[in-house]
Amino acid sequence: MIGVASGLAREGFKVFVTSFAPFLSMRASEQVRMNLGYMRHNVNLIALGSGVTMGYLGNSHYGLEDLAIMRAIPGINISSPSDCAELKKVLHDLTNQNRGPTYVRLTGIPGSRTVYSKDYNYKFGKFEPLTKGRKILVFSTGSVTSEALSAITELNSVGHSIKLINLHTLRPLDKNVLKEIKSF
């Protein structure tokens, strides 16, 4: 599947491949490493069920290591949208830009809470502060961001000062985040 996708990308097609996270990251890792990481073929991988969201299908569908595996392969962008609205923005961006090979890690399940409205202004590679705070800095990625936002909003309402940043793009890393960390 990755070989065919790479060939299509080499011929100029905009290519999206979707499968469960462990199959894209582990079973196809050599092809991903060679064709996407080293040869930089512009293929977008959409990984379903990262983490334990597909646990009801058994441990063969757990995508626990996918992020570590993809981060070990040079040259691959990594996105982890927090909700469906953000996923829509990510896919729109990948359809309209040539970002190079990209791994989109989907961690949500049907019925997951939303973080963003549909008019949210997504920017690839730029971290998104979701709350204001000056004492504690929290980073979140993927569908757990909605839970973090809910908890931090409640804590801030009773006097805490917590800033939550959504890490929707895990590679490339937004260099401004280092300034955020230094300021805390």
PLM feature segments, named:
Residues 1-7:
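Active-site-flanking structural segment that lines cofactor/substrate pockets
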Residues 7-137, 162:
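Conserved thiamine diphosphate
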Residues 21, 49, 142-144, 168:
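Residue-level signal for short, function-critical loop segments
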Residues 29-30, 148-149, 175:
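Conserved strand-to-helix beginnings and helix N-cap segments that scaffold or border functional pockets
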Residues 110-111, 144-146, 169-172:
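Short, catalytically relevant binding-site loops at active-site mouths
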Residues 135-145:
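Gly/Ser-rich, acidic/histidine-flanked active-site/gating loops
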Residues 147-165:
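Short helix-loop-beta junction
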Residues 168-184:
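Glycine-rich, anion-gripping cofactor-binding loops and their flanking helix/strand elements
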